From Swiss-Prot:
<comment type="similarity">
    <text>Belongs to the UPF0291 family.</text>
</comment>
<dbReference type="Pfam" id="PF05979">
    <property type="entry name" value="DUF896"/>
</dbReference>
<keyword id="KW-0963">Cytoplasm</keyword>
<dbReference type="GO" id="GO:0005737">
    <property type="term" value="C:cytoplasm"/>
</dbReference>
<protein>
    <recommendedName>
        <fullName>UPF0291 protein Bsph_1689</fullName>
    </recommendedName>
</protein>
<dbReference type="InterPro" id="IPR009242">
    <property type="entry name" value="DUF896"/>
</dbReference>
Length: 77
């Protein structure tokens, strides 16, 4: 999870960019922070999806095959 300070900094830089007052150095910092945020988000989402088990009303496991394979590959690596 990204720290509160980094998220606040992303928001500060975005607000500054809306006003057109962003320096080249700040634009690079914003790009790096956004990339870090998206990488963290994607990893968390992937982990969440890989740990989901879908069950129908009758109690049968109907988890999509792609998710099952991802889960299996995760434990093999």
């Amino acid at each position: 999870m990204l720290s509160k300070e980094k998220i606040n900094r992303i928001n500060e830089l975005s607000a500054k960019a809306k006003n057109g007052q962003l320096t080249d150095e700040e634009a690079k910092e914003r790009t790096a922070l956004r990339k870090e945020y998206l990488d963290t988000f994607r990893a968390t989402m992937r982990d969440t999806i890989e740990n989901v088990k879908v069950v129908d009303a009758e109690g049968n496991d109907v988890t999509p095959e792609k998710v099952r394979q991802a889960k299996k590959n995760k434990f093999l690596n």
